[in-house]
Amino acid sequence: MSRLKELRKKRGYTQVKMQMLTGIDQSDYSKIENGKRYYTFEQCRKIAIALDTSMDYFAGLTDEDKPYPRVEK
């Protein structure tokens, strides 16, 4: 199972819910999730925000599915 699908299910979201949260058509989202279509940088960003994770998690650069903490200046 892809990280994207795994995390979506962990959050209890359907593909229709992801469409509502990201604005990505459900058909396109399904293709992205199943590896039949690549996502754009902007789509990846929207998905990461919707699933409360980092884009690095989807890229396999980290195994931590939580977003990075923001640094206060």
List each language-model region with its residue ranges.
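Short alpha-helical DNA-recognition segment
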Residues: 12-34
